[in-house]
Amino acid sequence: MNAPAAFESFLLLDDKKIYIEKDTKVPNAAIFTINKEDHTLGNMLKIQLLKDPEVLFAGYKNPHPLEHKILLRVQTTNATTPADALTTAITDLVGELSLLEHRIDSAIKKCTQSTDTERGYN
């Protein structure tokens, strides 16, 4: 079979997680190659980047279904760099995901408490 071994989808081995390449076709742009990631992270980063008013363009692609990497292209205004915009987007995503985790934990706790009360455990 032509498919790579399953472990190749998540083990970095001696490879770097991210490579940055300046995009010479457009001003103030870069292409980030993020290894061992897929559409989940690519779409989250793209959406978060597009919320930033300093980001003019953000898009990603997976070059091939059997390659476990994404190419994220970012173009910004002169007020910031693509790397800074990506760092800000990642920081904002971590905050949003932490808030989501907290809300889920609270909802589970509330549901468990109400179920325990209904069953007479409290």
Swiss-Prot record:
Belongs to the archaeal Rpo11/eukaryotic RPB11/RPC19 RNA polymerase subunit family. Gene3D superfamilies: RNA polymerase, RBP11-like subunit. One of its GO terms (cellular component) is RNA polymerase II, core complex. Pfam families: RNA_pol_L_2 (PF13656). InterPro entries: RBP11 (IPR037685), RBP11-like (IPR036603), RBP11-like_dimer (IPR009025), RNA_pol_Rpb11_13-16kDa_CS (IPR008193), Rpo11-like (IPR022905). This is Probable DNA-directed RNA polymerase II subunit RPB11. It comes from Caenorhabditis briggsae. GO terms for molecular function: DNA binding; DNA-directed RNA polymerase activity; protein dimerization activity. One of its GO terms (biological process) is transcription by RNA polymerase II. It is found in: Nucleus. CDD domains: RNAP_II_RPB11. Keywords: DNA-directed RNA polymerase, Nucleus, Transcription. It comes from the Eukaryota. Its main location: nucleus. DNA-dependent RNA polymerase catalyzes the transcription of DNA into RNA using the four ribonucleoside triphosphates as substrates. Component of RNA polymerase II which synthesizes mRNA precursors and many functional non-coding RNAs. Pol II is the central component of the basal RNA polymerase II transcription machinery. It is composed of mobile elements that move relative to each other. RPB11 is part of the core element with the central large cleft. Component of the RNA polymerase II (Pol II) complex consisting of 12 subunits.
